[in-house]
Amino acid sequence: MDKTALLQHYFGYGEFRPGQEELVDGILAGRDVFGIMPTGGGKSICYQLPGLMLPGVTLVVSPLISLMHDQVMALKAAGIPGAYVNSSLTFPQLRAVYRNMLLGKYKIIYVAPERLQSDGFLEAVEQMNISMVAVDEAHCISQWGQDFRPSYLKIVDFIRLLPRRPVIAAFTATATQKVREDVKRILDLRSPVEVVTGFDRPNLWFEVRHPELKDGELLRLLEARKRRSGIVYCATRKSVEQVCQLLTDRGYAATRYHAGLEERERMENQNAFLYDEKTVMVATNAFGMGIDKSNVNFVIHYNMPKSLEAYYQEAGRAGRDGSNADCILLYAPRDVQTARFFIENGSDNEDLTEEQREVIKKQDYERLEAMVTYCKTRTCLRGWILEYFGQKHPEVCGNCGSCAKEYEKKDITKEAQMILSCVRRIRDHLGYYVGKPTVVRTLQGSREKKTIELGLNEISTYGLMKTMSANAIKELISRLEDGGYLVTELEHQTLRLTEKASGVLYLGESVEVLVLKQEEKLQRLDDDGMTEDERELFDLLRECRSRLARANGVAPFMIFSNATLMDMTRKHPTNMTAFKRVSGVGEMKASWYGKDFLRVLKGAAK
């Protein structure tokens, strides 16, 4: 079969998504390739499909045990022989996999980078024809990447040990230009076919909220999404426990996941979410990156992550099946303190040198600064993300929380002059910059001991804004940060003037900010456009999928995604020929599951 026939036969798609065919053709022509595609953009097909067509075996290097398991289960569900090699396997299981590798029973083998240098794996590989090495999450090989893993450097040594250099295929969803160049250099990609399909996920709605009480806001969001499946990310284990308890007390089918739980409980909770027994997963970032669940309708961040790379990767768990999905971040200033704590205490990897730790810490603070700016910006959120990753974009996307709000301009030149002048005079008086609280206290004319001891009551801007509340002054400072007049140096939490501030202080330039004409609570829900009858049929098909999933020991989305069930609902096939035309079905799955689904479809047609 040719590539298009294989795409239909095994994966159920009649055509390639953007970028896929170019990468597949490159691999089949013996070229190295580098695919930069968003989460849910179909990266796995780019190496799985040519892996079926190449004469030898494809090795896929992946950093995540749970992702390997899910990917191999999905391969088997599609009728493709695959296996994985990682630390989750017992010695007898590992020995059985090695034996089957030598017998040529697998076309695609997932392997953890740590296993590439193990004697048993190397002995098996020496006797195999390796046609391709695919590197998933390729940004992990670069120290400039947000998930740098020294174990990924072993990939290069492993490839050199092979008797013949295979095709090298690298893939990532989140990488700046600097990281991309580093990946190509380290992996020694030779004149690669490089495809950047863009980082945009048009089906995702982005929104940042600044609630006074996060619990109440979270409950309101979930109340509007009762029928939907989603993830609530928290920054700490303690927050996970508290939020999960809150949701279960309110009757939500919620479960939890964090590194503090026993592995058995983590797996039970993960499977309950994957099998749709629980609809809400409350988790730290230990969950999600390796989960291939396609029918996640929303991702809510209860706390701000420490980088846009992390945020976009976690938010990208939503809408993988192409359906509309919501990505909502609940921001509070204390989230910055939590992120700083993780940065200061996060570089405990024993494989890193002290110099590497310092480089990573500096980069982490730069990323945190970008993340905070995203949370505060009033410009297009999608545009902000795309610009960060170096992609051009329209000024307004029309599909995010910022674009849905109506703003008007307000002149705050007088207030800006007071604040900027105060920051400058404190620096001149003390010889160094101070934090935001000290600036606010000075402007309010505080008589606190520290203010007096520093002599800040003697500068001309002391008490200049004494009629304003501390919160009002803080909000103005935030607006000046948004406008680029001030910047918070996050490592030491000092408020500093930028070059742009000089125009206001010395040249009489005015300052205008955008304010909401009317504060409104946005509530974007996924409008699937289904009629009442279609919704009823869709639910029956979901029940059929759940029954088959339990019977076959696989997650429901591995049988068919929500997008496939939706297409099935709308096309309403009543015979096998029509059933195979449903997007995402394919020959193999039609032969295994077709009769069961057609029974439901025919029953609904009566």
Language-model segments: which ranges?
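Short, charged low-complexity linear segments at domain edges
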Residues: 359-389
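Short helix-to-turn junction characteristic of helix-turn-helix DNA-binding domains
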Residues: 27, 222, 273, 375, ...
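Hydrophobic alpha-helical transmembrane segments of integral membrane proteins
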Residues: 46-47, 59-60
